[in-house]
Design a protein with these regions (language model features):
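Conserved nucleotide-cofactor-binding alpha/beta core module
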Residues: 74-191
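Class I SAM-dependent transferase core
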Residues: 1-82, 90-94, 98, 111-127, ...
Length: 218
């Protein structure tokens, strides 16, 4: 496989047509090498438009979704980021390349180790990975955050996560239950108020222990 040609095809045929037009984001996809975050047995699929298995029943996001998230939350060099669900470490690597620091929380110890190893090998030093369950309660010990990214879906968006956004902070989450889910960007405008934009429809596996929607019994 010609890796650089495959990377080029991923950017031009999958990602750019998906309304990812920020040139800084597109350029980053050439410098943060996705194939180095993919399990060895799936390296040939590193640039494919699919969710690659990474163990523990979890999968990497599709490349176009990763790029779109980065474009929408638009991290700045002064930003502190919370990532819920480290996985392979690739999304954290993209965020860290634009932000001051990324605090990533992974519920599976094996994936914490996998993500940390990948990040270390890639020379990315401004990511801290911790084992924990941040799906419903966030990670208040380092709050507030300028950016929060959930790498799995949640039936409802927990108030705790919104409360951990700094003024002007942006949160990306896929909200809902299959088959109806929306990728959503929530921006804190201060005084406990938020601006919400639905970006696109998708279906994404839920985070472990994500907040459940209340069920009404008649």
């Amino acid at each position: 496989m010609n890796i650089e040609q495959a990377r080029f095809n991923m950017v031009e045929q999958q990602i750019r047509p998906w309304e990812v037009l920020d040139q800084a984001v597109l350029d980053l996809l050439y410098t943060v090498r996705r194939e180095e975050f993919v399990p060895e047995q799936y390296r040939a699929l590193a640039f494919s438009d699919l969710e690659i298995p990474i163990g523990e029943g979890e999968r990497m996001l599709q490349p176009k979704v990763e790029a779109r998230i980065l474009q929408e939350v638009a991290p700045k060099k002064t930003d502190k980021v919370l990532e819920v669900g480290t996985g392979s470490g690739y999304m954290a690597a993209l965020l860290a390349s634009r932000a001051r620091h990324v605090q990533s929380v992974e519920i599976h110890p094996a994936l914490k180790s996998f993500g940390e190893t990948n990040l270390r090998r890639a020379g990315i030093a401004n990511v801290t990975v911790e084992v924990g369950d941040a799906a419903a309660r966030g990670w208040p010990r380092h709050a507030p955050y300028d950016v929060i990214v959930l790498t799995g879906s949640t039936p409802v968006l927990p108030e705790a996560l919104l409360d951990q956004l700094a003024p002007g902070g942006r949160l990306f989450a896929v909200v809902g239950e299959a088959p109806v889910m929306e990728a959503r960007l929530v921006t804190s405008v201060g005084d406990g108020s938020f601006n919400t934009v639905d970006l696109f429809e998708t279906v994404l596996a839920p985070l472990r222990n994500a907040s459940a929607r209340e069920k009404f019994v008649f």
